[in-house]
Regions:
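Bacterial Sec-dependent N-terminal signal peptides
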Residues: 1-26
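N-terminal small/polar-rich segments of proteins
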Residues: 22-112, 125-174
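Exoplasmic/lumenal beta-rich domain surfaces
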Residues: 114-117
Length: 174
């Protein structure tokens, strides 16, 4: 009887251990840095001339149709990322401004923080900081909504112009 118990013990206890197996997988998580402005395309901001002498120019309504989308996977212990903006040219007497809203939509992770209202120049300025491992979702209504506006800063420097192209360059960097 003792032999029978020993055989049963071997069958039920040791055999399951003998069929246990392991696998080793190689995992790669790349460093990712992607940025997009959605939707694509241009928009127009035009000052309106006054209709009566002594009145100031009417400032155009700010554009709020553009969204910053990004994906960021940083190296272990790596620096957070930031998004900068600059313009290809400044217009004398006019401030070109951008403000990124708080991130919203389908994203997740350590999303960046808006730097508030930033007046753009030909030198890159931070508009979003503190981006860690994150994604915003894609397209409009995901990421950070941009408010792009114009303001007169010095009337003495204004000169008439028509259809002057201003290119805003956005860059994601560490």
């Amino acid at each position: 009887m003792r032999v029978k118990k020993l055989v049963m013990y071997l069958i039920f206890c040791l055999i399951p251990c003998a069929i246990f197996s392991q696998s080793t997988i190689a995992l790669t998580l790349p460093v990712v840095t992607l940025l997009d402005i959605e939707p694509a395309g241009t928009f127009t901001l035009n000052f309106t001339a006054p209709t009566e002498a002594g009145q100031s120019l009417t400032t155009p309504t700010a554009n709020t149709t553009k969204w910053v989308n990004y994906t960021s996977a940083i190296a272990s212990g790596g620096l957070t990322r930031r998004i900068t903006a600059s313009v290809n040219q400044v217009i004398p007497g006019v401030s070109i401004r951008v403000q990124a809203a708080t991130a919203s939509g389908a994203g997740g992770g350590v999303l960046g923080t808006s730097s508030g209202l930033v007046t753009l120049s030909t030198t890159a300025a931070n508009i979003i900081t503190g981006i860690g491992g994150a994604f915003t979702g894609t397209g409009a209504n995901n990421g950070h909504r941009l408010t792009i506006s114009l303001a007169v800063n010095t009337y003495a420097n204004l000169s008439a112009r028509t259809n002057t192209p201003i290119v805003i360059t956005y860059t994601i960097t560490e």
